[in-house]
Amino acid sequence: MNTNDIWLIAGLGNPEAKYDGTRHNAGFAALDYLSGKWGISVSKTKFQGLWGQGEVDGHKVVLLKPLTYMNLSGDSIAPMAGFFKIPADHVIVLCDDITQNPGKLRIRPSGSAGGHNGLKSIIARLGGDGFPRIRIGVGAKPRPDYDLADWVLGKFPAEDAKAITDRYADLEAAANLIMDGKLSLAQSKYNG
């Protein structure tokens, strides 16, 4: 293992139990899947987050669930990245995406926040948008006048939850490809 090959994978969400199973916590749920699959316990506390570290296919990996609430996610991610000297392009963010149908993945190497306040916070705290992200489709509001906060903080219907969990293996494979330096391949194989 190359000692400089370290990655931070952060799943975004809100920390209280009442938010479990909500659209906005899709990143937390995906990180829980990776934690279980990779055998990395996310139970230590540091920099306003729950974290753990391990090795995945030769890569040193730090998994993080910021406990700052969604809109302040950068307040946990940036100090954690700084502590481990992880450059922004080795920070992979998992988050919800209301512009994609449930279960659709959208992998990007960088880009704007696209209206996502968690990403906005991370961009501000890291000082740029040059970090990869895997956005998890949670579905759009049912109608334009539907309150956005009510929508993202609402629970998934069973069929939407299944559409998302059915993509966890693809999300894991995409994260592995990104860590292997094959982000473009991850996009072509798993976007959509």
Which ranges hold each PLM region?
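Nucleotide and nucleotide-moiety/phosphate-recognizing core
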Residues: 1-110, 120-134, 141-147, 154, ...
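Hydrophobic alpha-helical segments within soluble ligand-binding/sensing domains
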Residues: 114-118
